């Protein structure tokens, strides 16, 4: 597959009060964000509540997203599995519903050494129906993907890249250096999931972002990315300052409660999360709307 780069949306999954996926709102959201210049769609990650949805729901989400996205746009759903067999079965299902790659987190119960991480992902890459993007999100999985493991995996033809949501620029530079030292940088895309540090990640060598903010302000994320790529760093820093303010507002409540409330305020779906997790309260929603209105988001 072509190298992953640019702004890929970490897509929300609109649901009703009972946690049933709202496919009409999902189609509306995909059409909204893909019409604004993003380069890919990543449903069912942390922002998309993939860990909370049943397999049947997840397959239906991928099907709707793939049918709603423009032809040829990468569709990269999240995989949160506890063993290789479970992961491979899920990946095969996604392949049959239009996915083009998968975003795979490490198993999250036992600690994993670098060798164990490499072994797990290598086994998946050897057998999976789709290319892998490794997902480093230690705040949720409690497993940090070791740079040495990622560098070794980067040479695998079925490993396309890594999304780093660790919010640790030191880790990111160590990772990028390890991949470069392994001679695999040309075919392996490091993408950030931390828009508050987007400029720094891009300057360090990341190729783009898979981000929640693109659900709400895709044009702003794209403007930051484009400014860095054009060498307009003063503009990029100013735009990122605004993006940080938006991000701060959208991090209120449990992930991704504020994002759900924000797109509802924009006319897409409702504010509900997948049960048992709770949405923002009416008071919290009013405060969020006030903050986003002051930032010219609403």
Feature annotation, model-predicted:
Residues 2-144:
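Active-site beta->alpha loop and helix N-cap motifs at the rims of alpha/beta catalytic domains
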Residues 3-12, 32, 36-38, 203-206, ...:
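C-terminal alpha-helical cap/extension of soluble enzyme domains
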Residues 14-17, 53-55, 111, 139-147, ...:
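Generic structural "secondary-structure junction" signal
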Residues 19, 61, 93, 166-167, ...:
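Hydrophobic side chains within alpha-helical segments
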Residues 26, 58, 62, 87, ...:
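A general structural signal for well-ordered alpha-helical segments in protein cores
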Residues 36, 60, 64-68, 93, ...:
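Alpha-helical structural signal in soluble globular domains
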Residues 72-73, 131, 160, 182, ...:
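Secondary-structure boundary/capping positions in well-ordered alpha/beta enzyme cores
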Residues 126, 138-251:
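Catalytic alpha/beta core domains of metabolic enzymes, predominantly
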């Amino acid at each position: 597959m072509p190298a992953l780069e640019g702004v890929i949306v970490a897509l929300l999954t609109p649901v009703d009060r009972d946690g049933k996926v709202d496919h009409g709102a999902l189609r509306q959201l995909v059409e909204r964000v893909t019409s604004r210049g993003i380069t890919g769609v990543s449903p069912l990650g942390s922002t998309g509540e993939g860990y909370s949805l049943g397999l049947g729901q997840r397959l239906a989400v991928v099907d709707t997203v793939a049918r709603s996205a423009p032809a040829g746009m990468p569709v990269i759903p999240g995989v949160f599995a506890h063993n290789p067999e479970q992961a491979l079965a899920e990946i095969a299902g996604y392949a049959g519903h239009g996915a083009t790659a998968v975003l795979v987190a490490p198993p999250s119960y036992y600690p994993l050494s670098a060798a164990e991480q490499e072994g797990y992902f290598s086994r998946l890459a050897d057998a999976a129906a789709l290319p892998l993007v490794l997902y480093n999100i230690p705040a949720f999985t409690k497993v940090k993907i070791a740079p040495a493991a990622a560098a070794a995996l980067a040479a695998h033809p079925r490993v396309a890249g890594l999304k780093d949501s660790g919010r640790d620029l030191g880790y990111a530079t160590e990772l990028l250096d390890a991949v470069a030292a392994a001679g695999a940088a040309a075919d392996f895309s490091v993408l950030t999931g931390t828009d508050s540090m987007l400029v720094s990640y891009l300057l360090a060598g990341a190729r783009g972002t898979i981000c929640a903010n693109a659900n709400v302000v895709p044009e702003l994320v794209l403007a930051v990315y484009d400014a860095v790529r054009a060498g307009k760093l003063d503009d990029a820093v100013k735009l990122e300052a605004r993006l940080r303010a938006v991000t701060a507002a959208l991090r209120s409540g449990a992930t991704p409660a504020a994002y759900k409330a924000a797109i509802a305020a924009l006319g897409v779906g409702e504010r509900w999360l997948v049960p048992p997790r709770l949405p923002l309260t009416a008071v919290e929603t009013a405060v969020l709307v006030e903050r986003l209105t002051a930032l010219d988001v609403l």
